């Protein structure tokens, strides 16, 4: 399922993704907050305490020579809400109990419309890898390969003005 793009009154944009997960909310919470589980699906290594509001965070790229960037935990309500600054973006993860597991909603507030298709495809791919990890199976594609598959869908859905910024650095040839 493709993500959605909304324009906010603040002049920013919000990417929204919803996934139904066949796992208890507590298991999904672990995947969102425990460093060893984040490594399986989150695009950077997170250094810092995700469970403490106000805590500083550092996001380090692995396998790519790119500078790290900073963030800060904004809100934590285990096991249903995690929100933090991710560089200039605000990432908000919400979990809700649902029949057969839980529902994950990821919202990424971005300040530049031209990033929407790129970032939308990126989060789509990361969430695919997260689902596979939760299911205990290997993802059929890496997040980068999955990004290549779904990027055009996001350009088509969000429009060319949402695709003025190219692929992530690690996918450039």
Regions found by a protein language model. Give the residues of each.
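Short, ordered beta-strand-loop transition motifs
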Residues: 6-12, 50-53, 75-77, 96-99
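A conserved amphipathic terminal alpha-helix motif
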Residues: 110-171
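Hydrophobic ligand-binding cavity/cleft-lining segments
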Residues: 1-45, 170-173
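Beta-strand/loop substructures that line and gate deep hydrophobic ligand-binding cavities in soluble
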Residues: 74, 83-134
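Glycine-centered loop/turn positions within well-structured domains
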Residues: 26, 80, 102
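Charge-dense, helix-prone N-terminal extensions
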Residues: 4, 57-59, 66-68, 99, ...
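Glycine-centered tight beta-turn/hairpin loop motif at sheet-sheet or coil-to-beta transitions
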Residues: 12, 64-66, 88-90
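Short beta-edge strand/loop motif at the mouth of beta-sheet-based domains
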Residues: 16-17, 35-70, 79-81, 142-151
